């Protein structure tokens, strides 16, 4: 079942989103322990209007677990959301690293899909596809964009099948 995220989903979503940051090899993930990062992500989902704020998230629930999620928002607010990271209770070493995603990727006239992630336990079941289709079909009047690692052939194929174009 696909539904909007709630604050109580924060622990499961944080663990999933951490997988993306780890794959992206972000500086903050290299320098700060997994436990501390997941704790901050949990807080960002509930306490501040960061990219990962729960109102920007839809989850795929299966067996009473968050099997996957998609994070999307108005692209014109991307950097405003990013600055909210600094409103978290950051320790000095984390503050010195800076915000996790300081470069603007979204265009102001687009709605930006920040992330689509499926739990390793549920991969290969079409969850990412269903999340993307749900988002696009329930918000068909929006112009959607996303970024993808060009080496991620499986994701690129999925995005192309759903009508996304390489720019």
Language-model segments: which ranges?
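Conserved acyl-donor/pantetheine-binding loop and adjacent beta-alpha core of acyl/acetyltransferases
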Residues: 74-111, 115
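A short helix-loop-beta-strand connector motif used in the catalytic cores of GNAT acetyltransferases and
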Residues: 45-59, 76-80, 112
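Conserved acetyl-CoA-binding loop-helix of GNAT-fold acetyltransferases
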Residues: 115-120, 124-137, 157-161
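Conserved GNAT-fold acetyl-CoA-binding loop/helix
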Residues: 22-45, 56, 90-93
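Conserved beta-strand in the GNAT
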Residues: 59, 65-74, 112, 117
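Conserved catalytic-core motifs of GNAT/GCN5-like acyltransferases
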Residues: 75-77, 145-148, 160, 165-167
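Conserved GNAT acetyl-CoA-binding A-motif
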Residues: 109-111, 132, 138-149
